[in-house]
Amino acid sequence: MDGDRGKRDSYWSTSPSGSTTKLASGWERSSKVDTWLLILSFTQWALSIATVIICIIISARQGYSMKEYSMTVEALNMSSREVKESLTSLIRQEVIARAVNIQSSVQTGIPVLLNKNSRDVIQMIDKSCSRQELTQLCESTIAVHHAEGIAPLEPHSFWRCPVGEPYLSSDPKISLLPGPSLLSGSTTISGCVRLPSLSIGEAIYAYSSNLITQGCADIGKSYQVLQLGYISLNSDMFPDLNPVVSHTYDINDNRKSCSVVATGTRGYQLCSMPTVDERTDYSSDGIEDLVLDVLDLKGSTKSHRYRNSEVDLDHPFSALYPSVGNGIATEGSLIFLGYGGLTTPLQGDTKCRTQGCQQVSQDTCNEALKITWLGGKQVVSVIIQVNDYLSERPKIRVTTIPITQNYLGAEGRLLKLGDRVYIYTRSSGWHSQLQIGVLDVSHPLTINWTPHEALSRPGNEECNWYNTCPKECISGVYTDAYPLSPDAANVATVTLYANTSRVNPTIMYSNTTNIINMLRIKDVQLEAAYTTTSCITHFGKGYCFHIIEINQKSLNTLQPMLFKTSIPKLCKAES
């Protein structure tokens, strides 16, 4: 440590030039401090004297200084106002200039940039869409969707109330809602349009119908027209069907009995392509060809044709047809309802009713499935499942609905609403009352039918509106119903309200025992045929589309017409 102190003293005692300096002694430092204190004391005394003199002068001139002070303040205020006005004017000019620039950018500059960017994006998409590997991606770029708040009516969500219990009301009476109809028609006087099929998906709808150019009899040639569109609101705030794209299939292909499904941005239809009449088809082994058509919103279409050997049938069939009414889409599959004649009948007891009927047994019901007019074939309903429907070659599998779960096989439709699948089948046999229920598509297939006593259909004399006793007959007409409540007890439909004739089309809202609210389309003599009803909600408010084949009597042809009603659901207040 002593060595280090010696080095430091040596450093500070040496100047940069190398010469040595003498360190000031303690006495010399003390003398300098006393001198500075004396100087500071004198300065303080001088400042005190100066302050006293200034105060005396101010007091002497006080009378004059107050007036000068006021004038000074006023001058300062005026100067401040001038500065304020100058600043305000300057700021206003700057703001106006900047606002003009912003307005110019918004009205001109930004739109120009947006248009340029839009063109760039469109060009990029077009270039991408020219590549085959991106075709599926590009097909999804067309933005078509139902109006906001519109969705297929789901009974579980619809049939409820904030307070109280829901019910169908008879007052006020339902009425037709105004709006246009753009269903496909005929360009010839004698043209006949038949078999309307409507599927309403989450984003779009699909509609299909068959056109025969001369009369309604099958002449071996017919057009099939498939439309895709969306549901919008018209100026009266009522829903409308708005077609976006339409495709007409070759008249020589003679598609028949087509069922449709709308899912995603595509429409699918499954049709039969018969080369013989129906009775001849049932009398021979094997089925006529089936065809699956695909149509997208860009108008692109694709068709897959299947021969008997290419369809996975669980039993040999002599005839098989899609059921006209719409099908459903599930994960990876399309499911259509179908019907046809088995080459060899199945064993088992079918749905039956013997109470109140004379000389009727279970055997009577079993034999009633075998239709003499169709070569004695046992007519059953089937599930037609199209697997991998997005692939290059979808596969078709047919599963027969057990005869223990069903009545006579017939036309019909499927609806997937919420977590339930609803089934409707035409009352073509002895059971004339409405046939609607819940289908369990797991194995084995089961149907929980909802008994309806109020709704029926016209039929021949032996199987008319009121018939409930088993016997062999093939009659009736396709008049499907849409479930409004989860148990399908409350429904919307269009019935031909007559005993034996296809007349008097009437829109009906009904429960299992009573017709609650109804509207006759015209009069009891108006001739009609097939009807189909599909319902939607718009932010919870229910509406139904009714498509009815109306007989243009002066022309003696059929033409589907579109009608719309508001669902008369109310809430019963709790007492």
Curated annotation (Swiss-Prot):
Compositionally biased intervals (Polar residues): 11-23
Segments in the Intravirion topological domain: 1-37
CDD domains in the cross-refs: HN
Sugar-bearing residue positions: 77, 499, 511
InterPro entries per UniProt: Hemagglutn-neuramid, Hemagglutn/HN, Sialidase_sf
Region (Incorporation in virion) location: 10-14
Chain spans, region Involved in interaction with F protein: 59-140
PTM section of the record: N-glycosylated; glycans consist of a mixture of high mannose-type oligosaccharides and of complex-type oligosaccharides.
Subcellular localization(s) per the UniProt record: Virion membrane; Host cell membrane
Quaternary state and interactors: Homotetramer; composed of disulfide-linked homodimers. Interacts with F protein trimer.
Annotated protein name in UniProt: Hemagglutinin-neuraminidase
Source species: Sendai virus (strain Fushimi)
The organism's taxonomic lineage, starting at the top: Viruses, Riboviria, Orthornavirae, Negarnaviricota, Haploviricotina
